[in-house]
């Protein structure tokens, strides 16, 4: 399956769009949004980890959701690529006026992309607030995790 086919899939399945010109326009626009229009005919195995993350974002954005769910968006990425993905998340959130739910163990990602953070440990909500509020916590588990 090429990147084009990967991005066409939710359009065909969820939105029932089958007109090839419309599909092409939507796919090209989504890939331009994430800076990967040149990868349209590549296969996923030909992409770097950061490129795959961008394709995942494009595949979701193509459906114009009100809420974006990111599950470990920077996992396995180097610091530079992680920062680029964080910036892309913010850019897309602002451009499309979407809310984001970000599940992450990456403190930099949480600090950069989040207005509010819920810190869960063992399925228990240990704290909720801004990153600054979390930094001020006296909770030993949070301090150990955030390593301040």
Where are these regions (language model features)?
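Catalytic Walker B motif of ABC-type/P-loop ATPase nucleotide-binding domains
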Residues: 68-71
